[in-house]
């Protein structure tokens, strides 16, 4: 059995927190194992003056980490699952899906306690087309502007007065112990989360079963089921990370309750679908919900988004 395991991770404070968390969990479960971190920047980290949807390409936050693994410099990579492409490069696989943290989006403002309190014409910041579509649908009177950078950078722009409010992932703020910045969490009814939001995944080389044996102890089966359903819906819609697609799976007894949506960027049209299915076949349920959305015209909305990017 390996004595040392090397984790490729992004350099941002949140990514480092996630890698440190996985390191601690692995060392707790495997006595004598030493876990090392290899921090690096990715394409998505370096290009901060262009909306993510316009940069294009899959693996904006994952490719450089995979390159380190290919070069033999790292054994695994820790990812926020919402950044992981629907299809991984050949030879790579997800060896563990960790227990999901809060999947919601958080409303953050220095002047307003609630999203509904924002005055007409208020400037709302988000980097997500999914959030933009849903929040514009709820409040077409707002001005939604792009917001890039890590969590600290985004909060700094809010504090500098560039925005009246911003929306960030609840899980990221809580992991960085910035709970006090959250004015309230947006319900899934207001803003359906991104695929696998709040979930961490560990990527490894399929040809290395020894590594899989070490990491699969962290796999959380209930979260894995939810992740499979959400990613199957997203994959059928041919959605990447930067698309106006929301999806949220919940477990109810032996069933999965899956909600999905596709939204026009200006919020003028929001298509919704939901269904229940067996936990034994989450991917079939995901594809079914996607097909329902496509029947409503989701393909045309997404084509417009890709054409604008």
UniProtKB/Swiss-Prot annotation:
Pathway(s) annotated for this protein in UniProt: Porphyrin-containing compound metabolism; protoporphyrin-IX biosynthesis; coproporphyrinogen-III from 5-aminolevulinate: step 2/4
GO cellular component: cytoplasm
Catalytic activity reported: 4 porphobilinogen + H2O = hydroxymethylbilane + 4 NH4(+)
GO MF terms, alphabetically ordered: hydroxymethylbilane synthase activity
Cofactor comment: Binds 1 dipyrromethane group covalently.
Signal peptide: none
E.C. numbers: 2.5.1.61
S-(dipyrrolylmethanemethyl)cysteine: residues bearing it: 241
Pfam families, sorted: Porphobil_deam, Porphobil_deamC
Top EC class of this enzyme: transferase
One BP annotation, GO: protoporphyrinogen IX biosynthetic process
InterPro entries (UniProt xref): HemC, Porphobilin_deaminase_cofac_BS, Porphobilin_deaminase_N, Porphobilinogen_deaminase_C, Porphobilinogen_deaminase_C_sf
Annotated keywords: Porphyrin biosynthesis, Transferase
Keyword Transferase assigned: yes
Keyword Transferase in record: yes
Cofactor: dipyrromethane
Role noted for this protein: Tetrapolymerization of the monopyrrole PBG into the hydroxymethylbilane pre-uroporphyrinogen in several discrete steps.
NCBIfam families: hemC
PANTHER family (UniProt xref): PORPHOBILINOGEN DEAMINASE (PTHR11557:SF0)
Further details from the record: The porphobilinogen subunits are added to the dipyrromethane group.
Subunit relationships: Monomer.
Similarity field: Belongs to the HMBS family.
The name this protein goes by in its record: Porphobilinogen deaminase
Gene: hemC
């Amino acid at each position: 059995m390996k004595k040392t395991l090397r984790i490729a991770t992004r350099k941002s404070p949140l990514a480092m927190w996630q890698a440190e968390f996985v390191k601690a969990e692995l060392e707790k479960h495997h006595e004598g194992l030493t876990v090392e971190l290899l921090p690096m920047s990715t394409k998505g980290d370096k290009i901060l003056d262009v909306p993510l949807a316009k940069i294009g390409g899959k693996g904006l936050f994952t490719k450089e980490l995979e390159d380190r693994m290919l070069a033999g410099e790292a054994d695994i990579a820790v990812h926020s699952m919402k950044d992981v492409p629907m299809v991984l490069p050949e030879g790579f696989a997800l060896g563990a899906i960790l227990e999901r943290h809060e999947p919601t989006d958080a409303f953050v403002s220095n002047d307003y306690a609630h999203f509904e309190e924002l005055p007409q014409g208020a400037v709302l910041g988000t980097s997500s087309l999914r959030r933009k579509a849903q929040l514009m649908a709820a409040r077409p009177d707002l001005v939604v502007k792009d917001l890039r950078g890590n969590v600290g950078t985004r909060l700094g722009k809010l504090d500098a007065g560039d925005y009246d409010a911003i929306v960030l992932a609840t899980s990221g703020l809580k992991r960085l112990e910035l709970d006090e910045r959250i004015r309230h969490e947006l319900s899934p009814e207001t803003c359906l989360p991104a695929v696998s939001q709040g979930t961490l995944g560990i990527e490894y080389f399929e040809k290395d079963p020894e590594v899989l044996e070490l990491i699969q102890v962290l796999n959380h089966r209930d979260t894995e089921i939810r992740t499979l359903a959400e990613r199957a819906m997203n994959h059928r819609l041919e959605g990447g990370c930067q698309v106006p697609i929301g999806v949220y799976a919940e477990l109810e007894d032996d069933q999965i309750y899956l909600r999905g949506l596709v939204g026009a960027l200006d919020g003028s049209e929001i298509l919704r679908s939901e269904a229940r299915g067996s936990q034994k076949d989450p991917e079939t349920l995901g594809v079914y919900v996607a097909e329902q959305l496509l029947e409503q015209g989701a393909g045309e909305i997404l084509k417009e988004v890709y054409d604008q990017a």
